[in-house]
């Protein structure tokens, strides 16, 4: 499941380390991924997952055929990888010769160490907002093996109709998946209310203790939200 789908699923149940203790919850999620038409500007699609931008600033635009209104909207990127190339490689001898010696030297100096780029970002432009996704390459000191990302545009009555991904640098970009996901808000309130129908009553708080009473109609899991801190333990 993607992060938005996981968020949606937690309105139907809870994740347990041990399985088989309770029946599995039936997922009734309202998260959808609307179909989108892709348009490329300054970008070549080499295969199903690989895109080549010969110059800085290439664009990939996704237009949603049937936009989803009144929802929480996220842009999902899975399996991202980036290999830097020099924009000089995409220039012909005629183009280079047409430049002045001064401009040519400046350009060569600008891209002398293009292959050393340790990070790259995706700039997101849409009709409901803008965003940015940072990707650290394996040669970065901040690299942590992360290749999947989600940018959350939040909730809005207005549907996302179009999103443009700006590729800032020349190079090869790989994406296993580029998609818009929308969690509809129609049933969120009712599902949240259902989760809290049987809750802890007469709560008492003490030093290292929390007490209360609860009546359930079936075997259930009691979820208690506590501020995170190291050193916590629970005895029931």
Where are these regions (language model features)?
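Active-site-proximal, structured, solvent-exposed surfaces of multi-pass membrane proteins
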Residues: 1, 5-236
């Amino acid at each position: 499941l993607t992060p938005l789908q996981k968020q949606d699923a937690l309105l139907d149940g809870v994740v347990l380390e041990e399985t088989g203790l309770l029946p599995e919850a039936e997922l009734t999620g309202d998260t959808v991924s609307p179909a989108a038409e892709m348009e490329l500007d300054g970008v070549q699609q080499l295969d199903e997952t690989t895109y080549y931008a010969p110059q800085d600033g290439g664009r990939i635009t996704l237009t949603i055929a049937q936009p989803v209104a009144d929802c929480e909207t996220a842009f999902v990127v899975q399996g991202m990888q980036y290999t830097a190339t020099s924009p000089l490689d995409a220039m012909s001898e005629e183009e280079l010769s047409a430049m002045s010696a001064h401009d040519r030297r400046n350009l060569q100096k600008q891209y002398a160490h293009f292959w050393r780029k340790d990070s790259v970002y995706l700039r997101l432009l849409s009709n409901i907002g803008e965003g940015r996704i940072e990707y650290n390459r394996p040669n970065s000191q901040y690299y942590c093996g992360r290749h999947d990302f989600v940018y959350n545009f939040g909730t809005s009555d207005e549907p996302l109709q179009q999103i443009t991904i700006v590729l800032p640098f020349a190079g090869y970009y790989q994406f296993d998946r580029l998609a818009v996901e929308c969690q509809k808000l129609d049933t969120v309130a009712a599902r949240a209310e259902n989760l809290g129908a049987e809750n802890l009553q007469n709560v008492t708080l003490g030093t290292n203790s929390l007490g209360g009473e609860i009546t359930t109609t079936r075997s259930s899991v009691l979820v208690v939200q506590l501020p995170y801190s190291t050193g916590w333990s629970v005895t029931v």
